[in-house]
C-alpha cells in the first residue's frame, strides 16, 4: 500500500502543476499572432505619440569612446504629421527590406537551410551522440543539444528524436533522452559555443534600435555575447547532467518494455553514404578555417583594422555573417555531394531556393515589426522612456546587479505567453536598451539578461508549437503502456531544468559582474568600459 501511495504521489504533483500550466496556456492563447500583435503596437505607438507629444526629458549621454558626458534633451514627437506620414508611405519598401534581422536571416538561412535539406545536420547529430560511451551519454546529449540550436528548431528536434532512440538502445528510459535533449536545446538559446540564428537576429534588432538613437554600434555584432554564452554552454552541460541524475531520472523511472525501442534501434546508425559525407564536410571545414586563419595572420591583412588589430573592431568581426554563410555553404555542399544527395551541381540553386521557405513566416512578421520599430524610434518615445526610467533608477540607487535580475525575470515571465525570442526582443529592446544605456550599461549586457530569462522557460512554454511534437515522441518511445504522455509530462519533467538554467546563468552573470569580464570580443558590460 505504501509503495502504491509513493507511486501515485508524483501524479498528484503533476496534476497540480498542470493546473498552473493550463492557466498560462489559456492566457497565452488570448494573445494575437505576432503579425497582428505588431500591427496593434503600430497603432499604440501612434496613439501614445499623440497623447504625449511635446513631453521632454533630459539625460546624460555616456560616450562609448570615453569622452565627456553630454546632457541631452529629448522631446516626444507626434507621428501624425506630414513628414512622417509621407516618409513612411514613400519608403515602406526600404523600411521593410532594410530591416536588419530580415537582411541577415535571408543570407544565413540560404546556407543553414542547405545543411538541413542535405541531411548534414541530422547526420552530424547522429554521429556525435552515437560515439558517446554510456558513462558520459547524459553529458554528451546535453552538450550537443545545447549547441544544436545553431540550426534553430530543426537542430533541437533532431537531437531530441535521436536521443530517444540512443537512450533506449543503451537500456535507459527513452523519455529521459527526449526530455533532456529538448530542455537542453531550448536552454541553448542563451548558451552556445557556436554562433546561431538567434545571435544574428538579436544583433540585427540591437542595431535597428541603437543606430537611430545615436548609440555606438561598433560592439553590436553577432559575437557580442559569445564569451558568456560559451561559458554557459559548458557549465549547463554539467548542471543538466546533475539534474538528470538527481531529479529527472528517478522521477521518470526505469523502462518497462524496450522491445519497441530496440526494433527502432537502427534509426540512429549512420549509413555509409552519411559517413562519407561527414568526412568530406569535416575536411572542408578544416580547410576553410585554415585558409581563414592564414588570411588573418599577416599584419596588413584586409580582415584587420587599420592599426593591425582584430579586436575590438575590425573587418573580420564585421564579416562574421558572410563568413558563417560561406562556412555552412561549403560544408553543406561537401556533405551533399559526397553523400550522394547532390548528384549534379545544377541542383544546388534549387536547394538554396528551397532553404528560403523556412524564413517565410519571419518575413511576414517582419513587415509590421519593421514599421513598428521605425515609428517607435521616430516618436522619440524609447529615448524618453530611457531618460525618465534611467533618471528614476538613478534616484532610487537601484542600478546594480539586481536590476538585471529583474530584467531576466521579466523575460522569463513573458516567455510563457510569447515564445518567439526575436519577437519579444523586438518589443523590449527599444525600451530596455536606451533605458539602461543612459545609466552606463552596454546593449550587450542588457541582451544577456534578457536571453537568460528567455531561454530558461522555453521548454515549459505551453504555447510552443514544439510541445505537440515532443508529446508525439514520448508516445512513440513509451515503454509503459499504463501511462499516456501529455503536455503535463513535458512541463513537469522540464521544470527542474528550467529552474536550474535560470539559477546557473544568473550565478555566471554574477561572476561576470564581479570580475568585469568582457561579454564577447571587444564587448564590455559597461559603456566606455
Regions found by a protein language model. Give the residues of each.
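Intrinsically disordered, low-complexity non-transmembrane regions of multi-pass membrane transporters
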Residues: 1-29, 59-80, 249-276, 525-529
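Core transmembrane alpha-helical segments of multi-pass membrane transporters/permeases
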Residues: 4, 31-43, 47, 67-122, ...
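Cytosolic juxtamembrane amphipathic/interface segments immediately preceding
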Residues: 13-31, 88-92, 125, 215-220, ...
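Interfacial loop/helix-cap signal at membrane boundaries in integral membrane proteins
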Residues: 19-20, 58-98, 212-221, 297-315, ...
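Membrane-core helix-loop-helix motifs of multi-pass transport proteins
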Residues: 25, 29, 160-255, 271-276, ...
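Hydrophobic core segments of alpha-helical transmembrane domains in multi-pass membrane transport
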Residues: 37-53, 105-113, 144-146, 184-188, ...
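Interfacial/capping segments of alpha-helical transmembrane domains
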Residues: 51-83, 198-202, 300-308, 379-388, ...
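Hydrophobic alpha-helical transmembrane segments of multi-pass integral membrane proteins
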Residues: 105-107, 133-164, 169, 363-369, ...
Amino acid at each position: 500500500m505504501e509503495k502504491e501511495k509513493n507511486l501515485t504521489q508524483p501524479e498528484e504533483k503533476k496534476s497540480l502543476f498542470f493546473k498552473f500550466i493550463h492557466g498560462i496556456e489559456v492566457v497565452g492563447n488570448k494573445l494575437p499572432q505576432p503579425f497582428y500583435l505588431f500591427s496593434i503596437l503600430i497603432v499604440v505607438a501612434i496613439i501614445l505619440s499623440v497623447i504625449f507629444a511635446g513631453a521632454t526629458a533630459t539625460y546624460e549621454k555616456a560616450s562609448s569612446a570615453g569622452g565627456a558626458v553630454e546632457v541631452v534633451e529629448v522631446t516626444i514627437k507626434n507621428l501624425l504629421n506630414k513628414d512622417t506620414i509621407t516618409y513612411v508611405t514613400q519608403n515602406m519598401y526600404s523600411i521593410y527590406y532594410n530591416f536588419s534581422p530580415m537582411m541577415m536571416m535571408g543570407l544565413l538561412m540560404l546556407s543553414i537551410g542547405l545543411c538541413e535539406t542535405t541531411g548534414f545536420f541530422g547526420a552530424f547529430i547522429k554521429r556525435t551522440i552515437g560515439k558517446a560511451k554510456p558513462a558520459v551519454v547524459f553529458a554528451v546529449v546535453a552538450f550537443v543539444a545545447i549547441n544544436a540550436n545553431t540550426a534553430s528548431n530543426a537542430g533541437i528536434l533532431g537531437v531530441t528524436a535521436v536521443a530517444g532512440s540512443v537512450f533506449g538502445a543503451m537500456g535507459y528510459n527513452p523519455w529521459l533522452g527526449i526530455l533532456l535533449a529538448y530542455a537542453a536545446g531550448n536552454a541553448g538559446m542563451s548558451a552556445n559555443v557556436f554562433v546561431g540564428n538567434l545571435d544574428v537576429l538579436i544583433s540585427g534588432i540591437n542595431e535597428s534600435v541603437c543606430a537611430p538613437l545615436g548609440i555606438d554600434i561598433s560592439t553590436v555584432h553577432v559575437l557580442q555575447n559569445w564569451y558568456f554564452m560559451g561559458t554557459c554552454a559548458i557549465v549547463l552541460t554539467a548542471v543538466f547532467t546533475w539534474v538528470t541524475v538527481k531529479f529527472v531520472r528517478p522521477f521518470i523511472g526505469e523502462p518497462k518494455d524496450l522491445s519497441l525501442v530496440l526494433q527502432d534501434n537502427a534509426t540512429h546508425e549512420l549509413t555509409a553514404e552519411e559517413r562519407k559525407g561527414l568526412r568530406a564536410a569535416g575536411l572542408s571545414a578544416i580547410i576553410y578555417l585554415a585558409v581563414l586563419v592564414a588570411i588573418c595572420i599577416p599584419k596588413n591583412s584586409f580582415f584587420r583594422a587599420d592599426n593591425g588589430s582584430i579586436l575590438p573592431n575590425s573587418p573580420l568581426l564585421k564579416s562574421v555573417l558572410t563568413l558563417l554563410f560561406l562556412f555552412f555553404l561549403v560544408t553543406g555542399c561537401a556533405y551533399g555531394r559526397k553523400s550522394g544527395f547532390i548528384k549534379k551541381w545544377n541542383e544546388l540553386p534549387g536547394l538554396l531556393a528551397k532553404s528560403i521557405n523556412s524564413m517565410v513566416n519571419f518575413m511576414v512578421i517582419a513587415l509590421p515589426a519593421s514599421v513598428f520599430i521605425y515609428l517607435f524610434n521616430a516618436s522619440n518615445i524609447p529615448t524618453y522612456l530611457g531618460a525618465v526610467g534611467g533618471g528614476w533608477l538613478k534616484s532610487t540607487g537601484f542600478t546594480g546587479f539586481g536590476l538585471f535580475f529583474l530584467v531576466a525575470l521579466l523575460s522569463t515571465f513573458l516567455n510563457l505567453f510569447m515564445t518567439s525570442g526575436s519577437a519579444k526582443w523586438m518589443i523590449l529592446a527599444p525600451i530596455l536598451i536606451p533605458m539602461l544605456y543612459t545609466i552606463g550599461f552596454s546593449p550587450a549586457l542588457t541582451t544577456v539578461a534578457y536571453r537568460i530569462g528567455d531561454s530558461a522557460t522555453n521548454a515549459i512554454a505551453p504555447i510552443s508549437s514544439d510541445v505537440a511534437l515532443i508529446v508525439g515522441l514520448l508516445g512513440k518511445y513509451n515503454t509503459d503502456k499504463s501511462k499516456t504522455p501529455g503536455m503535463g509530462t513535458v512541463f513537469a519533467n522540464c521544470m527542474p531544468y528550467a529552474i536550474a538554467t535560470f539559477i546557473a546563468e544568473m550565478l555566471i552573470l554574477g561572476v561576470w559582474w564581479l570580475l568585469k569580464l568582457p561579454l564577447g570580443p571587444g564587448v564590455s558590460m559597461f559603456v566606455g568600459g
